[in-house]
UniProtKB/Swiss-Prot annotation:
Membrane-spanning segments: none
Coiled coil: none
GN (gene name): EN
Task performed by this protein: May be involved in shell and shell gland formation during development.
Organism: Lymnaea stagnalis (Great pond snail)
UniProt-recorded name of the protein: Homeobox protein engrailed
Family in the record: Belongs to the engrailed homeobox family.
InterPro entries in UniProt: Engrailed_Homeobox_TFs, HD, HD_engrailed, Homeobox-engrailed_C-terminal, Homeobox_CS, Homeodomain-like_sf, HTH_motif
SUPFAM superfamilies: Homeodomain-like (SSF46689)
Tissue specificity: Expressed in the dorsal ectoderm of early gastrulae in a band corresponding to the peripheral area of the presumptive shell gland. Also expressed at four points along the posterior ectoderm. In late gastrulae, it is predominantly expressed in the peripheral ectoderm of the shell gland and in spots at the posterior end behind the presumptive foot. Expressed in late trochophore larvae at four points behind the foot, at two locations at the base of the foot and in the peripheral ectoderm of the shell gland.
Compartment annotation: Nucleus
Low complexity bias locations: 416-431
UniProt biased composition (Basic and acidic residues): 228-239, 246-256, 608-619, 629-648
C-alpha cells in the first residue's frame, strides 16, 4: 500500500469532521507517520494515496506533526489541544499514575491539557518489531531508514525553543490545589485561548523503571508527532493498558523534589525535564534507563524497515510479536547504566537522572557518543548503536558532528559563556547544518532589507513629524514607536536620508543637528521655494512644517507671523561712502537699504538734464514753502487770539523729545468724536431759520403733571435715568400720559442735574477750545468767561 512518503508536493485533502489539512514535502519526506492505522472510520471518495493519509492525519495531529494545524470542530468535546511543549514543566499530580489520560475532562480547570491518541492497528513500534522478525532479514532494509537520531534531536530542539519562547509570556504561579508544594502551573497563550469544554487533561505521574509496556510503547508515535485528537466516540477504543498503569507503585512515582538537584522547578531556572515532556520509551528521552532497552529493541537484529512497509500480517500477530520481543529484550539485554556507569538489572537504577540543563542540551556533542552527563560521566551507548550504518543512511551515534550549536537564548546568537567542548575535542568541529536559533521576527527581517522601498513608495512622510513633547529624542523615540507598532510603514533605518529622502536642506539641521549639510544630495530635492532656502531662518515651533505648505498649521494662530528681515553675517557693518567706489563693491554689500553714494567724474547729457529738472523742482518747492511760512506769520500777527494762545503755550526746550509733545497733544482731533454731522468743521456753522413770533394763543400750554404722576416719574428716574421702549409704554399706560411727554420729562430731568452739578462734557470743552462748537451755548460760556473767543471771532473761526 502506498504511504504518505510518496507525496512530493503540497497537497490538500478533506477528511471527516475537519476542514482542510495541508502537508508539505519536507514533513512528508521525514516519514514520521509510518504506516497508517487500520480500523478507523470509513473514508469515502478518496484515492488510494489520500485515504491512508487522511486516516493517519485524523489519528496524529499535533504541533510537531507534518500536518498543519487546522480548525477544530465546535461540537467536539476535545479541542485541538494546546501545545504539549508550551510548558517547560507540567503539574505533577499524585492522583494520576499514567503518562497521559485519555478521558476528556469537562471541568473549569486552567491546566495545560492535551490528549494521547488511540492506538489502532500498526504504529511505528509495530513496524519496527515486525521489521526485526526473521521474515524480513533478507530484505536489505535498515531500521529507521529516514528517522535517524539527528532528526529526532532536531525535533526535540525545536520543541525546546518553542517552549522557552512561550514560557516567557506565560503566567507562572503556585497552584494551591496541588499537594506538592513546589508544583508550578504554567498557562501559556495557547492554553488560555483553548476553550475549557474542548480539552483533555494531561497529568504526569510516577513511572516505573522497567521495560516499556504496551501502553507506554503505544505512545511512541504520539510523542514524536506531538499530540493527536480524537472524538468522543473514539475515547472508549483506547488501547492503554490500565492494569499496567495501576500496578505502578506510589513510592516509585515521579516526584518534583527530585529536580532540586539541578535547579528549581520553574521555567526560569534553565533546566528542562525531558521525562516530563516526552515518554520514557521515546528515543528523544536519552536520560531514561528504559530508553536504552527500547533502543536495543530497535536495533537488535541489524535489519529494519524503511518508509515503505509492505507487510500484510494481521494486527494481532504484530502486537503479540511486539510483546514477546519486549519481554526478551527486557530479560536478556543488560547494558551499562547512563547514570552510574554500572550494570543494572531490569533496566533500573538507584540514581535516576531525568534532568538536563539547557547548557547541556545545547552542547554540540549532546546525543553523540562522547556526550558527558551532568555529573561528568561519559555516556557510552551500546556497540550496536555505533556500528549500525548502511549505504542509505548515515550512522546515528558514531558521527562526532552535531547539527546544533551553542545558542544564547537571550541574544539569539552564539554565546561563549555557555558550556561548550574544547576546540581540541573532535566534537567541536563545525556543524554541517546551520545553527538552530529562534524564529526571526518580522521587524528583524525588515531591518535587513534595503531602503529602496522607502525611497520609491514612502515619499512625503517626513512632513508628518510628531511634537517634541511626545518624543524628546526624535532620532530614537520616533523610530522605536513606529518600528514597534507599525513595522511595515516606517521601519527604523540608520541613515537619516533614507527616512527623509526629499526633505529640504534648511530643515535637516533642525531634524538632525549632527548631520552636516555636505551630506545632502541635491538630486533628491525636487521642490524648494525661494523663501525657504535661507539657512538662517528658524522654525516657528519645533518641527513646524507650515512654511513648507505655505499656510499655518496651527489653528490657535489668527494670522501667520510676519517674516523677519533676513539676517546675514556682516549685516551690522554698514558701509561708509568712500571715494571711488565701484559697482563690484556695491554688489558685495548685503544691506540694500544703506548703499554708498557712487560718484563718477563723467556724466552723460541725459544725466545733466535730469539733474537740472530735479534742481528746478526743488527750488520751486522751496519757494512755495517760503510763501506758506510768510502767510502763516502774517495771520498770526493779525490775530490777537492766536497771539494770546501762542503766549500761553510753553515753549519746549530744544532738547525735548517729540514723544513728550505727543503725550500732551492728543493723537486724534476732537471733531472725530462728534456724534452729529453738524458738529464737524466741514458742515460749517449751523444755520437757523428766523422764527416768526407766535401769538399768545398759538403757544402750546405746558403739561401740568399731578402730584401722583410726578412722584411716580421721580421713583422711576431714581431707579434708572434712561427709559426703554417697553418701560416708556408701561408708564404711559399707567399714568395716562403720552410717550413723548414721559420722554421729554426724563430728558429735562437729566439736563437739570447736569446743570446743577456744573460738570461739563470734556468733549464739548475740547471742541470749544478748537473753535468747533457751533451751539448757542458758546455765548453763555463767553459771558461766564469760560470761553476766550468773542462771538464774532467764534463765527469767523468756525467759518
Amino acid at each position: 500500500m502506498e504511504t504518505i512518503g510518496f507525496m512530493k508536493n503540497i497537497e490538500t485533502f478533506a477528511f471527516p469532521k475537519q476542514e482542510t489539512v495541508a502537508m508539505d514535502d519536507r514533513a512528508a519526506a521525514s516519514n514520521f507517520l509510518g504506516q497508517p492505522p487500520v480500523g478507523g472510520p470509513p473514508v469515502k471518495d478518496l484515492s488510494a494515496l489520500k485515504r491512508p493519509a487522511s486516516e493517519m492525519v485524523k489519528s496524529h495531529v499535533g504541533l510537531f506533526s507534518p500536518v498543519k494545524r487546522r480548525r477544530h470542530c465546535g461540537h467536539s468535546s476535545v479541542s485541538d489541544l494546546a501545545r504539549s511543549a508550551s510548558c517547560v514543566r507540567s503539574l505533577a499530580m499524585k492522583a494520576k499514575n499514567t503518562w497521559m489520560s485519555n478521558v476528556p475532562v469537562m471541568s473549569s480547570t486552567h491546566l495545560v491539557k492535551r490528549e494521547c491518541p488511540p492506538v489502532q492497528g500498526a504504529d511505528l513500534s509495530d513496524n519496527l518489531a515486525t521489521a526485526s522478525s526473521p521474515a524480513h532479514t533478507g530484505k536489505g532494509y535498515t531500521p529507521f531508514e529516514d528517522i535517524c537520531l539527528k532528526q529526532l534531536l532536531e525535533v526535540s530542539r525545536h520543541k525546546l525553543f518553542r517552549s522557552l519562547e512561550e514560557v516567557r509570556g506565560s503566567d507562572v504561579r503556585h497552584d494551591s490545589r496541588c499537594d506538592v508544594p513546589r508544583a508550578v502551573r504554567c498557562r501559556s497563550l495557547p492554553s488560555r485561548m483553548t476553550p475549557e469544554k474542548n480539552s483533555a487533561e494531561v497529568s504526569i505521574g510516577g513511572l516505573k523503571d522497567q521495560s516499556p509496556s504496551t501502553s507506554i510503547r503505544s505512545n511512541l508515535v504520539s510523542s514524536l508527532l506531538g499530540v493527536s485528537r480524537r472524538d468522543d466516540q473514539e475515547t472508549s477504543d483506547s488501547c492503554h493498558d490500565d492494569d499496567d498503569d495501576r500496578a505502578i507503585n506510589d513510592s516509585e512515582r515521579y516526584d518534583v523534589s527530585e529536580c532540586d538537584e539541578s535547579g528549581p522547578p520553574t521555567p526560569s531556572s534553565g533546566f528542562i525535564d525531558i521525562e516530563a515532556d516526552t515518554p520514557p520509551c521515546s528515543p528523544l528521552n536519552l536520560t531514561t534507563t528504559g530508553g536504552d532497552s527500547v533502543s536495543q529493541l530497535f536495533h537488535s537484529s541489524g535489519h529494519g524497515v524503511g518508509d515503505r512497509q509492505r507487510n500484510t500480517a494481521s494486527t494481532d500477530a504484530k502486537s503479540s510479536h511486539i510483546k514477546s520481543k519486549s519481554e526478551d529484550a527486557t530479560k536478556d539485554k543488560l547494558g551499562p547504566c547512563c547514570c552510574c556507569g554500572t550494570t543494572c538489572s531490569g533496566g533500573t537504577c538507584k540514581e535516576k537522572k531525568t534532568n538536563f540543563s539547557i547548557d547541556a542540551i545545547l552542547r554540540p556533542d549532546f546525543g553523540s557518543g562522547n556526550f558527558l552527563g551532568q555529573d561528568g560521566h561519559t555516556f557510552q551507548p551500546n556497540e550496536d548503536h555505533q556500528t549500525v550504518s548502511s549505504a542509505q543512511t548515515t550512522p546515528r551515534f558514531s558521527s562526532p558532528d552535531s547539527a546544533f550549536k551553542v545558542v544564547d537564548l537571550r541574544t539569539r546568537s552564539r554565546s561563549e559563556s555557555l558550556s561548550s567542548p574544547s576546540s581540541s575535542s573532535s566534537s567541536s568541529r563545525s556543524s554541517p547544518s546551520p545553527p538552530l536559533t529562534s524564529p526571526v521576527s518580522l521587524r528583524q527581517k525588515w531591518e535587513r532589507q534595503t531602503g529602496s522601498f522607502m525611497r520609491r513608495h514612502l515619499k512625503g512622510q517626513e512632513h508628518f513629524n510628531f511634537p517634541q513633547s511626545l518624543f524628546p529624542n526624535p532620532s530614537k523615540d520616533l523610530e522605536n514607536f513606529i518600528g514597534r507598532d507599525f513595522p511595515f510603514i516606517s521601519p527604523p533605518q540608520g541613515n537619516p536620508l533614507v527616512k527623509f529622502p526629499n526633505i529640504f536642506p534648511d530643515q535637516l539641521s533642525h531634524l538632525h543637528p549632527a548631520m552636516p549639510a555636505e551630506c545632502v544630495d541635491p538630486r533628491t530635492f525636487y521642490y524648494a521655494p525661494e523663501n525657504f532656502l535661507s539657512k538662517g531662518q528658524q522654525p516657528l515651533l519645533s518641527y513646524d512644517m507650515s512654511k513648507l505648505f505655505g499656510r499655518s498649521l496651527h489653528p490657535f494662530l489668527n494670522s501667520p507671523p510676519k517674516p523677519q528681515p533676513q539676517k546675514r553675517p556682516g549685516h551690522h557693518l554698514a558701509p561708509t561712502p568712500v571715494e571711488g567706489v565701484t559697482l563690484k563693491s556695491v554688489g558685495t554689500n548685503h544691506n540694500p537699504k544703506v548703499l554708498p553714494e557712487v560718484k563718477t567724474p563723467v556724466q552723460s547729457p541725459q544725466g545733466d538734464q535730469k539733474k537740472r529738472s530735479r534742481d528746478e523742482s526743488a527750488s520751486k518747492g522751496k519757494q512755495v514753502a517760503d510763501q506758506n511760512v510768510h502767510l502763516k506769520e502774517n495771520s498770526q500777527k493779525s490775530d490777537p487770539v492766536l497771539k494770546q494762545e501762542k503766549g500761553n503755550r510753553k515753549v519746549s526746550p530744544a532738547g525735548a523729545s517729540p514723544e513728550t509733545d505727543k503725550a500732551k497733544n492728543p493723537l486724534w482731533p476732537a471733531w472725530v468724536f462728534c456724534t452729529r454731522y453738524s458738529d464737524r468743521p466741514s458742515s460749517g456753522p449751523r444755520s437757523r431759520k428766523p422764527k416768526r413770533s407766535k401769538a399768545q394763543d398759538e403757544k402750546r400750554p405746558r403739561t401740568a403733571f399731578t402730584n401722583d404722576q410726578l412722584q411716580r416719574l421721580k421713583r422711576e428716574f431714581d431707579e434708572c435715568r434712561y427709559l426703554t421702549e417697553t418701560r416708556r409704554k408701561n408708564l404711559a399706560d399707567e399714568l395716562g400720559l403720552t410717550e413723548s411727554q414721559i420722554k421729554i420729562w426724563f430728558q429735562n430731568k437729566r439736563a437739570k442735574i447736569k446743570k446743577s452739578v456744573g460738570v461739563r462734557n470734556p468733549l464739548a470743552l475740547q471742541l470749544m477750545e478748537q473753535g468747533l462748537y457751533n451751539h448757542s451755548t458758546i455765548k453763555e460760556m463767553m459771558e461766564e468767561g469760560m470761553y476766550p473767543h468773542t462771538p464774532s471771532q467764534a463765527g469767523d473761526d468756525s467759518s
